[in-house]
Structures are given as structure tokens and as C-alpha cells.
Amino acid sequence: MSLADQVLAVNDDLPIRTDKPVHSGKVRSVYWLTEEDSARLIKEKGYNVAPDAPLAIMVISDRISAFDCIWHGEHGLNGVPGKGAALNAISNHWFGLFKENGLADSHILDIPHPFVWIVQKAKPVKIEAICRKYITGSMWRAYEKGEREFCGIQLPEGLEKDKALPDLLMTPSTKGILKGIPGVPEADDVNITRQNIADNFAAFNFSSADDIALYEKLLKDGFGVISEALANVGQIFVDTKFEFGYVTDAAGNEKLIYMDEVGTPDSSRIWDAQEYQAGKIVENSKEGFRQFLLNYFPDPDILLNKDRMPEREALARDNELPEEALMAVSRTYINIAEKITGSAIVLSDNPKQEIIDILGREYGLID
């Protein structure tokens, strides 16, 4: 069994019964179930959703995305062994902890397999909800060049790279290209202010202006829950991105929930606390892979400059990365997942066949 066989690189070709096109994202693919299958599963499994709620099967892959490109390695390694299972295990753990702490639900209704979530359709809030406790990365690069205002928040002079910020900062950006919002450029991933959101809450898909404060509370409280839990296993929660949406429960009540993934090495920076005390930054997140890419290629500007996307895409397409680089990511993700969850991440010999077998046998979704 080769390493390449243990990687689920293509996840949009499963024979799951659907009457809609499969949505294939950078890492996850979404299969919308038929009305009949959604209604049947809601009844059979007792999911706490409206009887006619649309359901989907969300399948994670082991692909690795960085700088908006998918990367691959030598020897046919088209992803990172264990990455998908590690990401899902971490998110599942945090979503459970959020519930225990009286925060909000997630869009996940069922977990048939380590790579698979059954989710209910949500109306997404069109904001990348970013929270930062330390100044690093793109924020530090901008600060070093003299910028002091971020998302309408004024930062003081004298901040130092990789040091804690005076307060937990919420620095939201747009999710997708939003058109016709005064003061908000029509481009993906543009920084926005709280005032932008308050003045145009409906355009960002908030149901009411009051929900802005609720999303901020869920963001701060969620950050706090994860930060405390990570501190208990010797890790620092540096910054992260959450996503939110609305769903309707079985009683017909609309509620704001967490969606996508939370507190993972893909969506967050996580540092080793002991190394940080000793003055070193050891990344237990995808940031380590980003740094590898910046050092590996002779012209890092290609990776940082949005005007050079065609060159960047060619770089990702035409270069096989060393196997060891992807295995280093594998070790990072599996180790941090096992620290967080307290359970072993078991690599599957044939994840695709396992998924097909379970969804056919226990859910009746394979034709």
C-alpha cells in the first residue's frame, strides 16, 4: 500500500445519489441530496431540523491548498496523508465543546465516517469572521509598512512582531464578491469595518441588525473556548477564521450557527507555547507549509502578489513538491489533532471505498 493510495485526493466522483451538480471546493465537496432522501433521513435518523430541510453530504479530501492554489508532491502524492481526517476530528471536537459551553450549534447533523459530515443547508453570512490575538502574518507586514488602521480599528504605535495584541481583534473580510455595497470594493476577501456591516447588514445576509452583536459574541466566545483548551495542551491560539450561517430547526425557529470548520490548522495559526516562551515560533498549522513554499521557490513575490496569479497557478501545477514536505504537514496535522482530541487519528487504506460502503449500507444513498 503506497502513501498515494492512503490519500483521498479526488472527492467529487463518489456515486452518491444526487439530482444537482456536485459543488467541489478547494478541500471539500458537497453532494446535495434529493428531496426524497433528505426527508427520509430526517425521519429515520431523527435529525432536529424542519422535515423538508435540504441535506447534503460533505466529503473532505486530503488536498492541500495554500496561496489560493492546490499543491501536489512527487511519487503521485496529490495530498497529505491524514489531513482530512485530522481536520474533521478537530472541528468535531470544537463544535462539541461549543455546545457544552452553551454557544451555538453547527450545521453538522451526523458523522458517518471520519471524512464525511451530513449537514443541513444553511444561509451563509457573507463574512469571513477573523479574530486575532497576536500581530503576525499579513497584519504584521502591513503594520511594519506604516499601516495603523485595520477594519476601522486603530492600532497603537510600538507593537512588535509575533507579540500579543492589546485586545482580541475582530478583522472581518468579505466572503465572495459582494456588489453594490457603499465603501466595499467588489472583490473577494476585502477587509471591512463593523460600520460597513451595520450599515448594510442585509447585504451581508444578516437577518437582523441585532445579529451582528450575536455573531461577534459567538466569535469571541468561540475563540476563548478554543484558546483555553489549547493552552491546556501547551499550544497558543494565535488567530483564526470562523464562518456563520442561519438554519431552521424542527420547530421552525431560525438560528445563527457556526459552519464550515473551526479552530483547525487550515483556518488558524497555532503556536507551540514552550517554544514561544523560548523565543521561537513553531507552527502547528498550515502556516508552516506556507513558510516552506515561500522559502522553496526563488521568487516568493509570486505567492504574495495577487497580480501574479497566472504565474502562481503555473507554479503549483508544474512543480512536484518533495514528499518529505507533505509528510511534514501530515505529522503536524495528525499530532495537533491527537493533542486536541485525545484520540488517535487512524489512516485508512482505502477511504473512498469505506465511504461508499457506509453511505450505502447505513444511509441508502448509493445507487
UniProtKB/Swiss-Prot annotation:
Keywords: ATP-binding, Ligase, Nucleotide-binding, Purine biosynthesis
Record-linked PANTHER family: PHOSPHORIBOSYLAMINOIMIDAZOLE-SUCCINOCARBOXAMIDE SYNTHASE
Broadest EC class assigned to this enzyme: ligase
Record NCBIfam families: PRK13960.1, purC_vibrio
A Gene Ontology molecular function term of the record: phosphoribosylaminoimidazolesuccinocarboxamide synthase activity
Annotated catalysed reactions: 5-amino-1-(5-phospho-D-ribosyl)imidazole-4-carboxylate + L-aspartate + ATP = (2S)-2-[5-amino-1-(5-phospho-beta-D-ribosyl)imidazole-4-carboxamido]succinate + ADP + phosphate + 2 H(+)
A Gene Ontology biological process term: 'de novo' IMP biosynthetic process
Top-rank taxon, per record: Bacteria
CDD domains cross-referenced by the UniProt entry: SAICAR_synt_Sc
Protein name as annotated: Phosphoribosylaminoimidazole-succinocarboxamide synthase
Cysteine pairs bridged by disulfides in the record: none
Family indicated by similarity: Belongs to the SAICAR synthetase family.
Keyword Nucleotide-binding among record annotations: yes
Cellular component GO terms, alphabetical: cytoplasm
InterPro entries in alphabetical order: SAICAR_synt/ADE2_N, SAICAR_synthase_Vibrio-typ, SAICAR_synthetase_CS
SUPFAM superfamilies: SAICAR synthase-like
Enzyme Commission code: 6.3.2.6
